[in-house]
Amino acid sequence: MEPSSPEPQAGALTVRPSSLCIAQVEQNHTWDVRASAEVALPGRSRPASRVPCKDMAFPRNQKLNLLRLTVLLIVALAGIKFIFRDSVTPDLHKHISKDNDFWGKAGEEKEEANPHNQALELSAVKIMGPKEDTKKQLSKDFSTTEMRLVHLDLKGAAPKVSYLEQVFPLLSKLGANGILVEYEDMFPFKGELETLKSSYAYSEDDIEKIQRLAALSKLEVVPLVQTFGHVEFILKHDKYRYLREVERFPNSLNPHLPDTLSLLKSILSQVMDKHRHSSWIHIGADEVFHLGEGMDSKNWISLNNGDVGKMYLNHIKEVVNFIVNQYKGLQVLMWDDMLRKISVGAIQESGIPKHASPVLWFYAPDFDTEQIGKFISKYADSGFKSVWFASAFKGTTGPAQAWTPLNYHLKNHLSWLKVIQAMSKFPFIKFQGIALTGWQRYDHYSVLCELLPVGIPSLAMCLQTLVNGGFTEATNKKILDVLGFQNIHLEKSTCEGNGAFPGSEIYRMVEQINGQLKESIAKVLEEESAIKGWFSPYHRKHQFGNPRNLENFGSKVLKVHEDWENFIQNFRSQLESIYFPDTVEEWMEENVNPYMDRLREFVRDYREIIRLNAKPKAL
């Protein structure tokens, strides 16, 4: 809830005109205190002084004394105003609007509340929405432009800005004209929202630089802010736990608490105030897990004929209305999956289609295009003026996927091409663009999917397929020329050549780790018969062995270990040039250390035991 203009409260400095012999300034209904005034100090009050005037004759000395008294009062007033000037403003800021029922009316005794409500009230004091001053976005005309947005999922493995500086020109060259930036905890939230940001969050200067770099490559920047589901990065914090739809799960917001909307307004305002040149904002709103399971929602549903869809729309309507009223000219995008279950009439009644566009997302290689057509017809009937689609170039084939399957994602885009080419069947709704999603995590708590450099060959194929209307010979040639490869093997998901794109070193090294690290270590440790016979886990546990037998396999194991350690050291350096330390450590822990640690422990035991020169086993 937004605070209204505060009224003066007890303890604040006030200046009251005396009732007689003062000069009233009629303009603006203000008072000229030069003639006579009375100062009311905090905690005190006294009757206004009565100063006789007109037709009253005074001796000369009395007139002088009165003049001196007046001067002294003016000086005293000025001094008191100076001393107390800093105490007035904070008191006014602390005032809570008496018109805000959630906070309770000023001067009234609050009703006794249950502990749950008390907890909400105490926490809610910290969440004050922004002052709603209407702001105008920079107007651009995209009426004849089909947008191709590349999704940057920054909830994991967020690249350094220096890497984005290299990547943006590549995206433009491949056919993108925008980026969909899902900041999550990488945005430099400040004030009460500072809790939300990561230790490695971008700075405000970084956000500005990202937009400047995007503009240089003619890429429209579309920020994405989740406003209902997938808000784990918010609800994981104790400070905001009470806003969960279901207390156990941090996935979705409770739409019935006033603080939910106040918090979202603050988040949206901070993000949009840093994106004044953006034409769209994406509010997420997909996969609102457990909606309707919270007690507040159950109570609402029981009073509204079980209409969960209407409950969903009510919340989205509040979010959309705030955006369009606060930022004139800004257009809203939202994922469509929750809308699929809601009736046309309910969507029409909500008014959302006036200001928002649904983004239909399907990531499978051969999805049902006829079903997509039914959804498009539904959204046209609901009153939406335009529709967007969402494909995937990486991050949808498994939560721990490290290597991108090229053919899988190419087929997904070929399916979307069929839909795009059939849009003439839907004259009452316009196709505005497609977002090529590149998910980095399935959610805030999952491990990393494919790194961005690993997904670039797939992204290049998908973008060029959309640009050229298919995966043609010309498409293939353009991809090879831009990326610096000699050939692409779709079924094997590999590319011939070293590559010459930003991050190509990481692409090649991840390919080796993904295809060779586990196998080479398993081969040297498990397939060597001498190890099974003379250096078993039992030998290692009791620290005994014959050097004559150990040396039969030792040099081979040591060579494999040395080669991989050198490789991993180089790989880590490449990662550190693009990613922040937390990403480097996470990727190594998940994809390298489980195999390398096994080899390292083996080599450590080997070196210790061979130095013992065939001593008896330790008991």
Task: Tell what function each PLM region has.
Residues 57-72, 79-84, 126-137, 165, ...:
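Substrate-binding groove of N-acetylhexosamine-processing glycoside hydrolases
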